[in-house]
A protein has these predicted regions:
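Sec-dependent N-terminal signal peptides of Gram-positive bacterial secreted proteins and lipoproteins
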Residues: 1-16
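Serine residues within intrinsically disordered or low-complexity segments
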Residues: 275-277
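N-terminal secretory/targeting leader peptides
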Residues: 14-121, 130, 137-268, 272
Length: 277
């Protein structure tokens, strides 16, 4: 799934400096690129999504507006990125929706286990204008603007223990994100959910701090988690939604021209072929 309508704009941010804001408005050209932060690796749908957005912004502005993409948690983990984005220090963030539940509880619509039967059903909701309008209001209330969604298919479990029945989940220490809905799901199965920053997962599996983890296939492969795990259990318990958001504080500094340029952006399907269904 990758049908986006991006109707927000750009303005100078804290990392670019107030001086560059004035220069950009006066000369119509940015002195520094605006940062877009992500915690995902380069070889993922998340990165391609972010780069496509940055490319379209530059193309439609004839090179006057530039965005630099920073993957691999270079600018911070998911929580740090959200906090910095809300403050306007990092204007753009592309990330999974799960960490956002702490900041905007209604984003949990994608964190209810076993709610969707197929990834196509998820995409139907995301592509529904009425649904998107409701979600955009949720982000507005939280201090952000929602520009669009993408997905990486469903999340699955990897483990070193063969799972043949529900009883086999009992006692397994599984890494989860810091999300109460995710943790409640694994507790209900008898597992022991262990919230952990993703950058620590590989070492955690290697050292035995955790027994298992759950992520979409692309994340498992790109981070070589298969080197530490023997089995994949296709639980398909949650869709892995990727959101592109912008700071509301950052948006206040937009010029009319910048808003007009971004209103023209429509990313039709830059990563559909890489999205696993």
């Amino acid at each position: 799934m990758m049908i986006l309508s991006l109707t927000a704009g750009l303005a100078a941010c804290g990392l670019a400096g107030e001086g560059s804001q004035a220069a950009a408005k006066d000369a119509g050209v940015q002195r520094y690129a605006w940062p877009l932060g992500s915690s995902s690796p380069e070889d993922t749908v998340t990165q391609i999504y972010a780069e496509k957005f940055a490319d379209e912004v530059e193309r439609l502005s004839d090179g006057k507006m530039k965005i630099s993409v920073y993957p691999n948690s270079v600018l911070g983990g998911d929580r740090e990125l959200l906090e910095s984005c809300k403050d306007g220090d990092i204007p753009f963030v592309v990330q999974n929706t799960a960490p956002q539940v702490t900041f905007m509880k209604d984003t949990a619509v994608f964190d209810m286990p076993a709610l969707f039967d197929s990834i196509d059903e998820v995409r139907e909701h995301v592509d529904n204008p009425k649904f998107m309008k409701l979600m955009q209001q949720v982000y507005n209330d939280g201090g952000y603007e929602l520009l669009g969604y993408a997905d990486q298919g469903f999340r699955v479990m990897t483990t070193n223990k063969k799972i043949e029945s529900l009883a086999d989940f009992k006692g397994q220490k599984i890494r989860t994100m810091e999300n109460s809905y995710h943790m409640a799901y694994w507790k209900a199965l008898g597992a022991s959910p262990t919230p952990m920053t993703f950058s620590e997962v590989y070492i955690g599996l290697q050292q035995g701090t955790i027994d298992a983890q759950e992520n979409p296939y692309e994340v498992i492969v790109s981070n070589k988690l298969y080197e530490q795990q023997d089995y994949v259990v296709e639980t398909n318990h949650l869709p892995h939604l990727i959101s592109l958001i912008v700071s509301e504080e950052f948006m206040k500094g937009l010029t009319d021209e910048q808003q007009q340029i971004l209103s023209l952006i429509h990313i039709s399907e830059p990563t559909r072929l890489l999205s696993i269904s």
